[in-house]
Amino acid sequence: PNPQPNPQPQPDPKPQPKPQPDPKPNPDPKPNPQPQPSSGVFDFEWIEKVDKSYAVHVTKTLNGVTLDATARTDTQEQNQDYAIQGKGLVLDGRRGQITITFPEGVKSISFDYKAFLAGNKKREILVSGGGISDIVSVGTDKQTYTKTLNKTGNVEITIKGNSGSKQFVIDNIKWTR
């Protein structure tokens, strides 16, 4: 008999995939921008320097919103604490101001307020910016100022004492956007 030549190996009808190396994490992933929370509160509990001077500068950015203030940070006077809830800021008609910048707009803003020290002297808060121009009378009991704005884009709100106002305390500045 005639010897058969060695048959050529036939290609596999289904090619086998080549082994792949273990996937490595992307060394430089592009971060997905995370949406900022749609609300927040400045409660002033982060203030470290408690001072009777009305020239104390405090600043804080929370969820993309920046508070910049010059105020008194000591809410105590004559052995009495006039704080609303923990720490707060004291302003009057001559000294102190709070500016809040909302770079992505603001739907609503609110804050708590009350008189600092006793007496029936005039105490008024001037709230301005973002289409607001409000004068708010201040009493000895805690009250809450609330305003709906529905503003987009960069909005700056200022809280300060109206001309001639005596001292008052501000706390718990809240917003939604």
Where are these regions (language model features)?
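Ser/Thr/Gly/Pro-rich low-complexity, disordered linker/stalk segments of secreted
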Residues: 1-38
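Extracellular carbohydrate-recognition regions
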Residues: 27-69
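Terminal, low-complexity interaction segments
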Residues: 40-58, 120, 129-177
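Extracellular/lumenal ectodomain signal focusing on beta-strand-rich modules
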Residues: 46, 64, 88, 108, ...
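Solvent-exposed strand-to-loop "edge" motifs in beta-rich extracellular domains
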Residues: 47, 103-106, 112-118
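Short beta-strands within extracellular/lumenal beta-sheet-rich domains
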Residues: 81-109, 142-144
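Extracellular beta-strand-rich recognition modules
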Residues: 100, 108-113, 154-162
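Short beta-strand elements bearing conserved aromatic residues within extracellular beta-rich modules
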Residues: 125-127
